[in-house]
Every structure is written in C-alpha cells, then in structure tokens.
Amino acid sequence: MIGKEENKFISFIKKNKFFASRKMGQNFLINENIKKKIVDSLEIKPDDHVLEIGPGFGALTKIVLSQTKNLTVVELDKRLVEFLKQEYKELRIINIDVLKFDFKEFNKDTQYKIISNLPYSISSKIIFKILKYANFSQSVLMVQKEMADRITAKVGTKKYNNFTVLLRITSEIKKLFDVSNNCFFPKPEVDSTVISFERKKDFDFTNFEKLESFLLKCFSQKRKTIFNNLKNYFPKQKIEEVFNKHSIIPTTRPENIKEELYLKMCFDFYDL
C-alpha cells in the first residue's frame, strides 16, 4: 500500500518529469518504517544540531525536523533544492557538492550529529572527510552492504583492507541493520546497511593523514608481503628495525596484521 509521502513523491516526479541521476547516485528511500528506524538510531534531542547529507526529497528530513529544528542539509541537485525549499520553509539548505563542503568550518564551535543515505560511489570519500574534519559527536549512515562488510571485516579475510583498519583505529563502529533494495526508488542492484560511528576519544586526529598515508602504503598491493610493500617507501634498515620491535614476519601479508599493530608501526616509522 502506498502511503501519503510516497504519493507526494510520485506526484512530484510525474509533474516535473524528474529522472533520478545515476551520476549523483540517486536512489530514494521510500519505506516509512526504515526512515523512522534510521532517524531513531541517531537518538536526536531537541537541542541537538544535525547535518543531513543528500536529503533528496526529504525522506529523513521531515522526521528529523519533528525532533529538532537545528537541521542543515547539503544537497547538490538544484531540482531537489527547489522541492525542499517549497516543503520546508525554514530549513537551512546548502546547495553544494558534499566533497567540496567545508566540514572543518561548519559548526566548528558546536558538536553536531550527522545522518545520511550516502551515494554509493563516493561514500568512502565522504566518510574520510567526516572523520578528518567534522566536529561531530555521532553519525548514522546508510552505505552499500558490501562497504559495511569491508568496514566490519575480520583480520585475515579478503575484505580486510586499509579502509577497514583506518576506521577501526579512529572510530567506534556499529553495524545496525540491513536494508533491502526494495525500499528504494529507483531500485538499486544491491542491498544497503545502516552503520553508526563516532570518533575514538583516545586517538590524536592530528595524526590522521599520516596514518591514512601509511596504510595506503601497507596495502598498496595486497598480494605482496608487507615488507615488499613498504620497501618502496622506507629504508630497509628502518623496516627491519620496526619489524623486529613488533615481532612481525616480513613475509606476512597486509590483511593478516591487526589494526593495533598498524598504529604502533605508523608511530615508529614516522617517529610520532
């Protein structure tokens, strides 16, 4: 049965001959129960400040606004910006590509929460930007299920990579629930997963870029050993020194090293 909000959505599409943009990764959430479940996961209080990335037709926006008026949305598609302006007169809308959005300056004196159904093609880039620059307390994001599986992958598995390690070291991550592709229009080819994450308080984020760079070196070629990957960037003597200190066998492959050990190695290689 089609609800009131779905009817409004379909009417707008027909009236405006709206076509979802593949380039922008537009798949709009239309399941009312899932919308509520996502927003409830963020545990919004009336005085909370919230940033929503890619609101689309306002699937989550309306529910968030019922819980706090301190909502800012970032939307690139001008067609959707016009729709949101008509629907939510007092909503603060920033019409910009989220990859160009200045997370560092936004609400820099007040922590805020982040909510989003992320575009699949750029979700990892957005997550990196959030972790690097955003002054956020908690984030609830919907990502491609495959990405969620990578984020939560166990050491020694094929999906365990530099992205996995970086997020594990810098943030507390929870896999909340899966979302069927039937909950979207147009229907994507894959299912999604909602995750929650927040920054770890014991990690010094001034070291984020060095850690990110180091992990890229370690996983530059997953089929090669950790030693062979690092020898292109560090002197052999330094590598042997660090490996001996942490009892690392040179023939170990990158996916077989725990995240805690990567952090220790990073500190030693860069003398942090």
Curated annotation (Swiss-Prot):
Disulfide bonds: none annotated. It comes from the Bacteria. It is an enzyme of class 2 (transferase). Keywords: Cytoplasm, Methyltransferase, RNA-binding, rRNA processing, S-adenosyl-L-methionine, Transferase. Its EC number is 2.1.1.182. It catalyses: adenosine(1518)/adenosine(1519) in 16S rRNA + 4 S-adenosyl-L-methionine = N(6)-dimethyladenosine(1518)/N(6)-dimethyladenosine(1519) in 16S rRNA + 4 S-adenosyl-L-homocysteine + 4 H(+). One of its GO terms (molecular function) is RNA binding. GO terms for cellular component: cytosol. S-adenosyl-L-methionine binds at residues 27, 29, 54, 75, 97, 117. CDD domains: AdoMet_MTases (cd02440). It is found in: Cytoplasm. Belongs to the class I-like SAM-binding methyltransferase superfamily. rRNA adenine N(6)-methyltransferase family. RsmA subfamily. HAMAP family: 16SrRNA_methyltr_A. Specifically dimethylates two adjacent adenosines (A1518 and A1519) in the loop of a conserved hairpin near the 3'-end of 16S rRNA in the 30S particle. May play a critical role in biogenesis of 30S subunits. This is Ribosomal RNA small subunit methyltransferase A. It comes from Malacoplasma penetrans (strain HF-2). The gene is rsmA.
